[in-house]
Amino acid sequence: MKNALFLIQKLSITTVLLWMIFREHRFTVEILPHFQAMVDHWPWTLAGLVFVGISIWLSAVRWEILLRGQEQNITSAEVLRVTVVSNFFNITSVGVIGGDAYRVLGLMQRPGAKKLPLMVSVMLDHMLGMMGMGILFLSCYAAFSHRLQTLGKEAYLILEGFEMFMGGSLVMIFISVISFTPRLYNWGEKQWPRMLGFQPLKKFVTACDALRRDWRGSIMAVLISILIFIFHFLSFHCSIYAVGGEAPLLEVMAAMPIVDAAAGLPISVSGLGVREKTFETLMNALTGLPAGTAVAASLVGWLMSVIWGMIGGLVFLRTSGASLSKMASVEKNAA
């Protein structure tokens, strides 16, 4: 009942946000013509779809590296299949948790698979993804920091605030990695034996220490994370040109981490409405992109991911021989 109410709330918020955006920018006048322009700019749409596909493949490569760090020897083809399918559950569930749940459950069926290492690999996957996005954003931010004073107050505050957020996140990730080391954990266990002596917690921390044990793999995973976001953000850059707009690449790269973070908030379904408003605000401030064009480009960028999500759904049905009841089971476990 609680999950149903939560979903209804998100659907309601999504509907209201989209209605307000479409009403403000007169959907049939300022937004719809940009969708029609995609017929003439189809190569940009195709390029965007390819970039999304590359980012998904790189996500599978990164996860495979982390799985090896957890001593889970699973074939590259299987990791790629589960990663592609997880995108289907990301767009059909109430959030990323659906895709993450499938990633664990999908590999649990493999011989020798263990639940804790799989769960930790997914958690570390997100952690190193955050690190990669932080490095990319701060690099782009530094590249045009000399222009910050020329921006409007709203955009300036958003960029400054996100810079502090990303900087703080990188520091916290670094502290977390250090806290996973056996020497520091053993010291802490002597100080607080009742809390840190809890065996399941010790097993969890030992699994997380794979970041240090396989430090070469961790560095490779961070570098791949940067590439993942570059290709993901390139798909939105292509979507701008697909709807007939233009925008410098550097500004798009700087804005997209903020857009992704806002869309990831558990407010609306798939970030709809929140993503469009954030994208519109930042693109207009950084590049002068008209509001209607920005909203259309944001929706097209999202639809590119939806298309790959539907491909993941087809792969799920074909390779797993899954029924609707199995899908419902995955969603129930995700909730």
Region spans (language model):
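Residues within alpha-helical transmembrane segments of multi-pass membrane proteins, especially transporters
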Residues: T92, M127, M131, L227, ...
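Membrane-interface alpha-helices at helix entry/exit sites of multi-pass transporters
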Residues: A77-R81, G99-D100, P111-H126, L289-V300
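Hydrophobic alpha-helical transmembrane segments in multi-pass integral membrane proteins
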Residues: P266-S270, K277-W302
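Transmembrane helix boundary and interhelical junction motifs in multipass membrane proteins
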Residues: W57-R62, G95-V104, L250, G264-F279
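Hydrophobic alpha-helical transmembrane segments of multi-pass membrane transport proteins
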Residues: S76-L105, Q109-R110, P117, A263, ...
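Mid-bilayer segments of alpha-helical transmembrane spans in multi-pass integral membrane proteins
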Residues: N87-I97, K114, H126-L138
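Predominantly cytoplasmic-facing regulatory/coupling regions of multi-pass membrane proteins
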Residues: M1-V84, A143, L148-G264, L289, ...
